[in-house]
UniProtKB/Swiss-Prot annotation:
Annotated tissue distribution: Highly expressed in adult lung and spleen, and weakly expressed in testis, muscle, kidney, brain and heart. Highly expressed in spleen and thymus, moderately in lung, brain and muscle, and weakly expressed in heart and liver (at protein level).
Domain of life: Eukaryota
Organism this protein belongs to: Mus musculus
Gene (UniProt): Pstpip1
Changes after translation: Dephosphorylated on Tyr-344 by PTPN18, this event negatively regulates the association of PSTPIP1 with SH2 domain-containing proteins as tyrosine kinase. Phosphorylation of Tyr-344 is probably required for subsequent phosphorylation at other tyrosine residues. Phosphorylation is induced by activation of the EGFR and PDGFR in a ABL1 dependent manner. The phosphorylation regulates the interaction with WAS and with MEFV.
Alphabetically ordered keywords of this record: Cell adhesion, Cell membrane, Cell projection, Coiled coil, Cytoplasm, Cytoskeleton, Endocytosis, Immunity, Inflammatory response, Innate immunity, Membrane, Phosphoprotein, SH3 domain
Domain (SH3) ranges: 358-415
Name assigned to this protein: Proline-serine-threonine phosphatase-interacting protein 1
Entry's Gene Ontology cellular component terms: actomyosin contractile ring; cleavage furrow; lamellipodium; perinuclear region of cytoplasm; stress fiber; uropod
GO BP, one annotated term: cell adhesion
Amino acid sequence: MMAQLQFRDAFWCRDFTAHTGYEVLLQRLLDGRKMCKDVEELLRQRAQAEERYGKELVQIARKAGGQTEMNSLRTSFDSLKQQTENVGSAHIQLALALREELRSLEEFRERQKEQRKKYEAIMDRVQKSKLSLYKKTMESKKAYDQKCRDADDAEQAFERVSANGHQKQVEKSQNKAKQCKESATEAERVYRQNIEQLERARTEWEQEHRTTCEAFQLQEFDRLTILRNALWVHCNQLSMQCVKDDELYEEVRLTLEGCDVEGDINGFIQSKSTGREPPAPVPYQNYYDREVTPLIGSPSIQPSCGVIKRFSGLLHGSPKTTPSAPAASTETLTPTPERNELVYASIEVQATQGNLNSSAQDYRALYDYTAQNSDELDISAGDILAVILEGEDGWWTVERNGQRGFVPGSYLEKL
């Protein structure tokens, strides 16, 4: 395994006035800050997408309908709607978790910014001090060099004048050489003083540079670790959401396994059956066969008219015979026993169709039902209803909270 390299050993520059290593490190930290923002933006957009998706799933589940279905498929569809809503809620919760992770990253990024700013301020100070003293030192060195050259020139001139010059020229040259030497000595003193100050500034800068490199490396280590963990957690959150979705949909699959197609068909037939026999064929009737030969001494009256009159009398409460009619006619209009039984039997069937409960019984609604017209009643699963009339066609008259209407009898169970 490769040994861990250190920033403090790899980001120096031989140019005294250059700070390339520090600038490279600082740019790396700024690039890392941008990377943090990129990850935050990814989490922000994913959270928005999860929230939109979750809310749309909830709306889809609540508007799915399915009230026209019944029995086991209705149960499975209701389970699908419920689990779809649960999946939507889970995705909304995932969006909240992503926003919490986003908030943590933002706080981490701001903490790193504050720490980096402190070191930037220190480095700016020591770098400016070093550069300023370096410039001052170089100027003093330049002055020192010039003073030394002037002193050398003055010394050489003094030596030439001393060999063959006048006393006055010798003294003048000697004084100039002395002054130049003193100026050179002073320039050397200033130069040495600046060198010492520059060395102290350089030492301070070097120490701060090492400290800053170590701090920047620690920041980079923390940033990489935090972002790696954040991406790992993000992937785990998405994977867990997939598992959660599958668990919720598994509940739907379990209800679908119990869906009985034949049972649903049988249940529909039992609750909605309209009869077991088809209508009888319509017989041919000869127009002239409807006329009946009248009896001797009685008026010519068709039997069908007598049947209609008797049927009307039963419906409206009129007497069986008309007082103004002759006795002979009354006897003639009396139908045969077979026809009489047919007429009365048909009326009795109509009068007794549907079992009217003398005392209303309580039933519980097994399913929701939405009224399709004004004479039906809306019910919800669990409602307690009083059954007034059990219709043979499968539609029962019920009462709830003072309201009456028709509901499917198969939707109720007796308490």
